[in-house]
Every structure is written in structure tokens, then in C-alpha cells.
């Protein structure tokens, strides 16, 4: 069994399907999708319909685009027709996503499945691969609030994170009322943070895999100079900085030459790519 992480598909369902074929994803495997499956690309409706009907071995986290969509959808329970999108989501692809959904058969019927699905999403999870805990999050955590010491008391910290978090079996909602890696972070931080996480020279208290921020060549040069001289990655590539692994490879900007969908096999950290231009 292999466990994979992918993020920021942004409505490129055909590319997503090609990735599933490339990794030979099967019923014994696990897939974690770290948010932002919608907006920007031409196939948001197909991606959302697939997401609301997948088997239990596929798990979704809430990204900032799901956050924007839920902010609108949760206030308009009657259906998609005539929905007021709002400026923020409209500026980030929401209008096109709603139009795409409306163009599909039974769109308003599927809307209620979509509401149920979106209401269940949380922005992070902690899983275990070979007895190693790994934090999965859409955007990142605020380094200012790191206060775990996994070297002195690893069992306590790992148990704390499990209590705070969410698992596929329990679907426990996140709470943020105690200290620790995740406990003091609000959901907005975990879905929207960028530079203060990406450019922090503080290692995360445990291995972390995140999306949201594709790393450009210029940003990687800054990381190599200021953060981690052993970092790797760059435009269109999965980044490895300290113990933080960024898997957004730029599908929000599909016309860039380097844009790709990246996927990371967490068992051995093997990388897989599908170019935005791959047909």
C-alpha cells in the first residue's frame, strides 16, 4: 500500500486523472488531496462531482478556494441558480466554477452533495507513515507558535496532535484551544499563510507536506541563501525545505511553461509530475 499527497488541482480534472494513471492508484492505496481542487481551470465541475463520490481511500482537506466557496455556498442553501458569488471568490475563479456547475446536468441536485462535502472539510490532518507522524496542511502553520519539543517528549506531542486533529475514521473537527504545533493556529492561517511559513528558517516540529504556494526559481534562490542551503525545488517542481515539502507546482497558472501537477508518494518521497500541457 502506498500513500500519496497532491494539492492545488485547480479544476484540471483531466490532468488529475492522468496523475492517477501515472501513479497506478489502486484500492489498496491512500490519496490525500490538500485543498484547492476548484477554480482557475476549465473542469471544476468534473473535479467536484468526482470529489463528492469517491471511495474512502481518498481524503480531502480544505484549501483557501474551498474556504471562499463555502463562505458563499453556506449562506445560500437554495441552489446554484442566482447565487451571489461575492467579490473575493469571483476574483479567484468562482464565477467560472458556478457557471461550469450550472452547465452540467442535475447541477442543483448535486449542489446538496457539494454542501455536505464542503462542510466536512478541515484544513489539516496528521497521519503516520512507518511510525513517522506527518502533518498534512493546505498552506502551512505559523512558525511563531511552534512550542512542541519532539526530542524531549515525542510521544506526548504526537498524541496531542492526534487529539487535535482529524482522521478518516473519526472525522473529528479541529479544535484550537491548547498549545502545540496546530492547537494555537486558526483555520484561516492553515489555509492562507504564505511567506512567513515558506521563508521561515525554523524547522516544523514534524515533517510537513503542504500546497498553496508554488515556489519560483527566484524564491528558491532566496530559500537557498537565507533558509536552507540544502533545499531543492523550483518552478514546476516539488520543493523540499528543511522538513517542509511543498507540492503546489503551479496549476493555478496553467499557461506558464513550467506549470505542472505534482504528487508525492509519502512512503519514499518519490515525486510524480503531469505537465499542464500534457495531453
Show where each model-derived region lies:
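N-terminal active-site segment of His-dependent metallophosphoesterases
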Residues: 1-50
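Active-site-proximal beta-strand elements of phosphoester/diester hydrolases
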Residues: 2-10, 134-140, 245-247
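Residue-level marker for buried hydrophobic side chains located in beta-strands
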Residues: 5, 31-33, 60-61, 135, ...
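Divalent metal-coordination and catalytic microenvironments
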Residues: 8, 36, 51, 63-64, ...
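Active-site environment of divalent metal-dependent phosphoester hydrolases
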Residues: 10-14, 39-42, 65-70, 143-144, ...
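Active-site neighborhood of divalent metal-dependent phosphoester bond hydrolases
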Residues: 45-49, 53-127, 131-134, 143, ...
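His/acidic metal-ligating clusters that form di-metal
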Residues: 110-137, 142, 147-217
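Binuclear metal-dependent phosphoesterase catalytic core
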Residues: 221, 232-279
